[in-house]
Amino acid sequence: MNRLQVELPGLSLKNPIIPASGCFGFGREYAQFYDLSVLGSIMIKATTEQPRYGNPTPRVAETPGGMLNAIGLQNPGLDKVMNSELPWLEQFDLPIIANVAGSQAEDYVAVAKEISKAPNVHALELNISCPNVKTGGIAFGTNPEIAADLTKRVKEVSEVPVYVKLSPNVANIVEIAKAIENAGADGLTMINTLLGMRLDLKTAKPILANRTGGLSGPAIKPVAIRMVHEVSQAVNIPIIGMGGIETAEDVIEFFYAGASAVAVGTANFIDPFVCPTIIEELPALLDELGFDHISECQGRSWKQTCHSR
């Protein structure tokens, strides 16, 4: 029995560990360190219809317990992803999750329609929560009606299940999650980064050229856990949880909150081996906690019954 195997819409994962979009590129750099086939999946870099060069520099700043980024969805564009990046990834035994972004609803629809045809793309991650672009991005993820409409339009053209990435920069994340579920989403991924800022002590000006950026890393984990805990009790579609995950213990905490799989982001910048290390350590942790299978941990913090030994 594979104690870590997870079945989600469109995704048969050998384990629930997935590098998060934006922190792993298209996997080329990390393939120098280990066989990417050990992973559950990869959420590839956000793809837009046309190439994007991103925001001006500086666009990364360290913070206590994390980092701020304002990359601005830099990517080579749909054609390059379809003709180069995705074919390269076919050498690995991996179902790919393609992150889809855009400035207008029509952009999302166009990218989703084409990229979902790729043979190794098994699901889409609809990026309606990037805080670092002036148009699109978070604008779609902070209004329930707009988020639902975009979800419905993408579902109509996608050939694979659609997961929607939620923003934490909202007053009521449950309301948005339920609207997206009602629009036909197959799953949710959460959370994206929290909007933040750092100021230079000598100039009193923002360190980032974009002024603000998305906060990620261990500092946001308690927020992510709280939001997964709330949303998982309100919807009937699976959640891929993310936000500050660095260890096997972090993974179990997200499962307890209600996640069915997890994505590891900023930690990849600190330790390129973090994902395989977590995968290796999870079975021993399950033994220690008295579980036969990782699915037994899902929603344990709020479910009335559990199946621990």
Swiss-Prot record:
UniProt keyword terms in alphabetical order: Cytoplasm, Flavoprotein, FMN, NAD, Oxidoreductase, Pyrimidine biosynthesis
Catalytic residue positions: C130
Keyword Oxidoreductase: yes
Any GO molecular function: dihydroorotate dehydrogenase (NAD+) activity
Tree of life domain: Bacteria
Cofactor remark: Binds 1 FMN per subunit.
Catalytic activity: (S)-dihydroorotate + NAD(+) = orotate + NADH + H(+)
Enzyme class: oxidoreductase
Primary localization: cytoplasm
Transmembrane portions of the chain: none
One Pfam entry name: DHO_dh
Binding sites annotated in the UniProt record for substrate: K45, N69, A70, I71, G72, L73, N127, N192, T193
Requisite cofactors: FMN
Protein role: Catalyzes the conversion of dihydroorotate to orotate with NAD(+) as electron acceptor.
HAMAP family per record: DHO_dh_type1
Name of protein: Dihydroorotate dehydrogenase B (NAD(+)), catalytic subunit
Classification of source organism: Bacteria, Bacillati, Bacillota, Bacilli, Bacillales
Gene name per UniProt: pyrD
